[in-house]
């Protein structure tokens, strides 16, 4: 008879089955706060693993980027095609304080603008704001028929396109370099730069659907808590707020101290 292990007989595993732990039990929810330039300040919530040893929860949250529709931030459905990127700069209590980190268009809006019989003109330029942010701003525009035009097409000549592109870059540079990031975002929301471009290019060729299509943050200045607090105006006031004590309670406290 052959002596050896019988492989068919399965042994019971050591320790038995491990208890399935809930991964959410070790996590916490944090509120995402948008800057004061937007109407809605509470953007949503984000999950993070609780502080354990050297792994600190607030450090894991810093640098997170959230993409939010401008329609949700401004309570205006007409702005639904614009996406805002917000980056967590600091964590205070259970609040993640964010700042502007870029802007983009939804794909469906961009596709709906491109049509036949017109010229698409694009331009991009790198600008630096007064508070030290380096941004790359992309602009898009389309030609339109002149008043009373019967001809089906409205194509611009190469020389006209170059002139329009130059004008675009001049206006974007002028608007961006004369203000800080907060003021610049306030210009992006109502599309005031696009309207300025259409107005100034009227003499070269009539334009329509002129938008700041995309904004990238290339370089940000060194983190400054005071500047972040300016963007999130209401938080600095809450810290160390003076509590007024009732007049009757004050003498009672003094008597207790002397006794």
Swiss-Prot record:
The keyword Electron transport does not apply. Transmembrane segments: none annotated. It comes from the Eukaryota. It is found in: Cytoplasm. GO terms for biological process: translation. PROSITE patterns: RIBOSOMAL_S3AE. Residues 1-22 are annotated as: Disordered. GO terms for molecular function: structural constituent of ribosome. This is Small ribosomal subunit protein eS1.
């Amino acid at each position: 008879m052959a002596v050896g292990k019988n492989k068919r007989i399965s042994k019971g595993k050591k320790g038995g089955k491990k208890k399935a732990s809930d991964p959410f039990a070790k996590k916490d929810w944090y509120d995402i706060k948008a800057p004061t330039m937007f109407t809605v300040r509470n953007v949503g919530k984000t999950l993070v693993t609780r502080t354990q040893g050297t792994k600190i929860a607030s450090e894991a949250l810093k640098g997170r980027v959230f993409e939010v529709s401008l329609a949700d931030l401004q309570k205006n459905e007409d702005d639904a095609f614009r996406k805002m990127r917000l980056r967590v700069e600091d964590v205070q209590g259970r609040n993640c304080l964010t700042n502007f980190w870029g802007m983009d268009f939804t794909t469906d809006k961009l596709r709906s603008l491109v049509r036949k019989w017109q010229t698409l003109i694009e331009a991009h330029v790198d600008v630096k704001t007064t508070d030290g942010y380096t941004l790359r701003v992309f602009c898009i525009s389309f030609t339109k028929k002149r008043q009373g035009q019967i001809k089906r097409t409205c194509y611009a000549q190469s020389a006209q396109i170059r002139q329009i592109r130059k004008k675009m870059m001049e206006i974007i540079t002028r608007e961006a370099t004369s203000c800080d990031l907060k003021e610049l975002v306030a210009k992006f929301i109502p599309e005031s730069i696009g309207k300025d471009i259409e107005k100034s290019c009227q003499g070269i060729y009539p334009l329509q659907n002129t938008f700041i299509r995309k904004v990238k943050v290339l370089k940000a200045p060194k983190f400054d808590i005071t500047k972040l607090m300016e963007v999130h105006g209401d938080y600095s006031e809450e810290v160390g707020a003076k509590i007024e004590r009732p007049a009757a309670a004050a003498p009672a406290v003094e008597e207790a101290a002397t006794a």
